C-alpha cells in the first residue's frame, strides 16, 4: 500500500513524470556540472538514505520499539525497510510508525502484510509518484518493493527495498539478475536509482553484488562504524546490508555527519558501540542488542542538485 497520509495503491505503474535523463539535461546546468552557466554553484538538497532490517523479537516485527527508535534517530529522508510488520498490520498501525520515524506528512509504500509474511517497504519525506512490488519468483513472502520518489530538482529517485534469501549465494545471484532486469525494463534512463536493504551476503564479492554493480555502485569504500567495521549482522561478522546507488547519484555522495562525527563512506549504526548515543536519540545503547535484532542500519548521505 502506498500512503501519503490518506490515499493508497498497491500496483501503481512507473511514471515518466519528472524523471529520466532528458529531464536532467534540459535545465540550466548540464549533467555532472557543479555550477550554473553564470558560474554560481548549483543549489543542492541534502538526501539521507537509510536501509535497515531492524525487526526484533520472535515475530519479526517492530513492536518492541528498538528498530523504531534507531530509524527515528537517524532522520532518514528515504528509508528502505525490511520485515515491515507493525502492530495489527493495519494501515493505521503502519501510518503511526511512519509518522514516528519520519514525521507527519511522510509517504510510504508497504507490501501488503496480508499477502507477504515479511514485507518490504519504503518510507520518505518526499512525495511518492508511483510504487509497487516487482515479482521475485525465488520467494513468496516478499517481493522487490519499489517507489518512484519526487526529489527536489529535475531527477526522480527510484528506490528499491530488497530482502534476499539466506539459502545461498546461487539463489541470491539469481535474485540479483532478476532485479537488474526489472530495473532496466522499468526505470527511465537518467533517473537516480538506489537498491538497499538486507542482501544476506556472506562477503563483498558474491555474484549478486557483481551483478548489481552493472547498475549501482557496489565498490569500496563501504559504510562503517567508528572502528571501521563495515559488517552489519548482529555479531558484526558479515556484510549483509547495503545502500547501493547508481553512478549519477554516487556523484553527489558526501560524508554522513551526525553530531560532531563524520563518516566519509557512510555509517553502519550499532548502538552498542556508537558514542555519544545521545546523537541518535531516542535510540538507546541497548537497542542493537535486542533479542533477535536482525541487523544494523546502513546510512549514506548525498547532496543532490536541485536545478
Regions found by a protein language model. Name each.
Residues 85-156, 164:
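Structured beta-strand-rich core segments of catalytic domains in phosphoester-bond hydrolases
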Residues 185-194, 201-307:
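Metal-dependent phosphoester-hydrolase catalytic domains
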